[in-house]
Amino acid sequence: MKKLLLLLLFVPLVSFGQVKNGEHNTYYESGELKVTVNYVDGVKQGLEKLFYYSGELKSTANYVDGLAQGEWKSFYYSGELRYTINYVDGLREGEENTYWKSGELVSTVNYVDNFREGEKNAYWKSGELKITVSFVDDLKQGEEKGFHKSGALNYTLNYVDGLTQGESKYYYESGGLKFITNYVDGLRQGEWKYYYESGELESIKNYVDGLRQGEWKYYYESGGLKSITNYVDDVRQGEWKYYYESGELDYTRNYVDGVKQ
């Protein structure tokens, strides 16, 4: 009897200690195949396939001794290629491409030792360039440019070690300046100016360390003052004034710690 009890106690320990070998499949509750992959001595080996609930192929991945290796692919539900990426010893290496369903590129970026390195480009569905920016050690570095669908310049931003830095400019598709901003170490700083498409000044806003600060002014396109507002540490404070386009005072509001009085 004691031997039988010892044997019964030993069996679960053996089963828990087993390592996966061969094909291993997991399924959706409906019974449809979800993942199929091969194991050798408990680690993934070879091709892994993932499937949508409908049975369509979702992605393929390759493993060597448990590490991601070679090309991985992802597919849209309808079957079109979504993206490709290459791995070397578990790290992203080389070009990653993402695609629209039509087959046109959404974006392309290069990896070195799992870090984005070099130029990244993103595209409109039409194939026109949408965004271009460079990476150094996985951080944005230097000038980023954005473009309208027409190809006209949309904006310019500057990055230093992944943080927005200095003056940025945004443009209307017609080419006119839309607004000018300023950043210091990723935070909004100083005077921001916004313009109507006609070129007339629309507003002047002030920031200190990312917070709305001081007097903000808004203008009618005709040039007349529209309103004056005030902030202290990102909170509405003091008297706010609103004007008719004729220049006459329309009404005022007063705020104390963000609460209208």
Give the ranges of each region predicted by the language model:
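Periodic aromatic/glycine/histidine/acidic cluster detector
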Residues: 4, 15-244, 248-261
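Repetitive helical segments and hydrophobic/amphipathic motifs
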Residues: 11-12
